[in-house]
A protein has these predicted regions:
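C-terminal catalytic region of ATP-dependent kinase domains
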Residues: 3, 12-42, 179-468
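Alpha-solenoid helical-repeat scaffolds
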Residues: 147, 459, 463-466, 504-511, ...
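Catalytic-loop Lys-Pro-X-Asn motif of eukaryotic-like protein kinases
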Residues: 170
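Low-complexity, Ser/Thr/Pro/Gly-enriched N-terminal "stalk/linker" regions
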Residues: 436-507, 512, 520-523, 527, ...
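Long, well-ordered core segments of solenoidal/helical folds
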Residues: 468-487, 532-553, 578-590
């Protein structure tokens, strides 16, 4: 039987010998992938034993509990990851192999905005050579004070905004009673540094990236509905719908024909929520209230904040995101697939594809190749005294060719601009709009069916459609980013709740690229002869022309909305309305 054959393979060397024959280098590969990680865990256990007294006094009320279990708490970088130590008497502690100065810096800032000592102590740390120990944050439900939780969330959002933090998705925050606790403090200043390292092709591009990367949207604390399909769900800390992810399962376990297969599942986690059934998107008013409170506190604490940022900010080591970690994770997982274990050159070709996602030189690519082959996610850092951007390989720090010219004094000036009255008003509008947009566009299935049935009952007379057109175009014009060089860009369209119908009546395709927007604006101009729209259309043509001259279309895909086909179709429509030499020449080149 299949079960008996499995027992035979399991109890004899037949299976192992067969694996050695089919995968002759597998054991050596596994050794290279795991030895560094195993040694890291052994070293941290040794550090725990050596510092048990200090750790016990700081975190365990003087007790010195023995280790019972160890869990990995995240991705592996350079053969290191967050470790959760489970000890006697249900006690836990966390070890993080990252810069100990970051959490100390953040704790100093948090003290200015929160009075509760118990909350401030949640960011306590104990430093050692390889990183630091910190408290294990328990998820504590609190149904009675949900509004207060989201008011505190608004204050944390303000702090993340001014400190240029990002990647604060649902896995990097824990709800602890009335308070949200940040569990990943590595991205302090990251958005500022990332924006400074980018290559800008025209002025509207520079302005759009600055508005987006230096805004509340980039923190990860707000939903971005346009990224839901890419990630399989809302990854922000305001999500409670779960993530659609591909998981590996075993079929026919305990039989000789058992195999691994992939299946999509909705994975739900509630650690970032004050309780499981809460609908975070309903608390926008409380989030805004907390954001406003933090803004007022800043006005009274600005001098104190300046001292902390200029003095302690110099020691911050900021993790810089140069590429989507999802791509790295996928390549790491694929290393375990039979096809890539059998043919290493095939895996090398897979890694080569990374070059199409960013600016790669030989050093950066070599570092990422080594990291991925050894089962690690590539990671990059910045520190004021260590420009350019760097990564780690074993004990060595490797500089790559991406640099930032920012100093802490420059970051302070950026922060002052962030808290200007104009920018605070803009950010509050972003907060409200992004949440309302997500409610409209990422509704639950039952809510969507109600929305669609309501839409079907709506009479779309010519006058109604014209009215809805005006609403849509007003929003497009309101959110346009115009450069000094006559270029134009959009950072995304947010939809107020009362304008949901307008977007449904006109065309959902306008979300799918600037060419789609251009076609919509041409149709609008034909109807209303609006000169502002005419100017934006001319700037869009000029922007496409600038991109073509800089070679950005040489390897561009040919899809309709985001590719060359869409641009060509837009230009064809535009030329039918305007006699424009730049558009005609560009159409021929496209």
């Amino acid at each position: 039987t299949p079960e008996e054959r499995f027992i035979y393979f399991d109890k004899t060397d037949f299976g192992i010998n067969k694996i050695k024959t089919v995968f002759p280098t597998l054991l050596e590969e596994l050794k290279n992938e795991f030895m560094g990680k195993v040694q890291y865990v052994v070293d941290i256990v040794s550090e725990y034993e050596k510092n048990k007294g200090l750790i016990g006094n700081r975190f365990f009320n003087g007790e010195r509990p023995e280790i019972i279990n160890i869990k990995c708490g995240g991705d592996w970088h350079n053969d290191k990851c967050v470790l959760i130590i489970e000890a006697e008497n249900n006690q836990k502690i966390v070890f993080k192999p990252t810069n100990k100065k970051n959490i100390e810096f953040l704790q100093e800032i948090i003290k200015m905005f929160f009075d509760e000592q118990k909350y401030i102590e949640l960011y306590d740390s104990l430093n050692i050579n390889e990183g630091y120990w910190c408290r294990f944050i328990e998820h504590i439900e609190n149904k009675a004070n949900v509004k207060e939780f989201y008011r505190n969330y608004g204050k944390i959002l303000f702090l993340a905004y001014i400190l240029g933090m990002n990647d604060l998705h649902y896995e990097n925050m824990i709800a602890h009673g009335r308070f949200p606790v940040i569990s990943d403090v590595e991205t302090i200043f990251s958005t500022y540094i990332s924006a400074d390292t980018k290559r800008y092709y025209y002025d509207a591009h520079r302005k759009a990236v600055s508005l987006l990367s230096n805004g509340t949207i980039s923190t990860g604390l707000l939903p971005v509905f346009s990224m839901v399909e890419y990630f399989g769900g809302d990854v922000s800390c305001l999500s409670n719908t779960g993530m659609k992810v591909k998981v590996q399962k075993i079929k026919n376990l305990g039989r000789d024909d058992m195999c691994i297969y992939d299946e999509y599942e909705i994975i739900k986690t509630y650690l970032h929520l004050p309780y499981n059934e809460v609908e975070p998107l309903n608390f926008v008013d409380d989030i805004l209230k907390g954001f406003e409170e933090a803004t007022e506190i800043w006005k009274t604490k600005k001098d104190e904040a300046k001292y902390v940022i200029l003095k302690k900010g110099k020691s911050v080591e900021s993790r810089i995101i140069l590429a989507m970690s999802k791509a790295y994770s996928k390549i790491c997982r694929m290393r375990s697939e039979v096809a890539y274990r059998e043919d290493f050159k095939k895996y090398e070709k897979l890694i080569e594809k990374l070059k199409s996602f960013g600016d790669y030189d030989a050093i950066r690519f070599s570092c990422e190749r080594i990291a991925l082959i050894n089962g690690n996610i590539p990671c990059y850092y910045w520190n004021e005294s260590a420009n350019p951007v760097y990564t780690y390989l074993k004990k060595n720090r490797i500089n790559i060719s991406i640099s930032s010219h920012l100093k802490i004094e420059d970051i302070w000036k950026i922060i002052l601009n962030q808290v200007s009255s104009e920018n605070i008003i803009r950010q509050k509008q972003y907060i409200e709009d992004t949440i309302q947009t997500t409610k409209a566009m990422v509704a639950r299935p039952e809510e969507k069916s109600i929305m669609l049935s309501n839409r079907n009952r709506t009479e779309c007379s010519p006058e109604k459609i014209k009215s809805e057109y005006k609403k849509v175009v007003d929003n497009i014009i309101h959110q346009v980013v115009e450069g000094k060089d006559g270029t134009v860009e959009w950072i995304g369209l947010t939809v107020a709740e009362q304008d949901q119908l307008a977007y449904q009546v006109v065309d959902s395709g306008i979300y799918k690229g600037n060419s789609g927007l251009g076609i919509l604006l041409i149709q609008y101009y034909i109807l209303f002869k609006d000169e502002k729209v005419a100017n934006i259309l001319g700037e869009l043509v000029h922007t496409y022309s600038v991109k073509e001259r800089k070679g950005l279309y040489d390897t561009m895909e040919t899809s309709f909305y985001n590719g060359l086909t869409g641009i060509y179709y837009f230009l064809q429509k535009y030329i039918a309305v305007y006699e424009n030499k730049e558009a005609v020449l560009l159409k021929e080149k496209i």
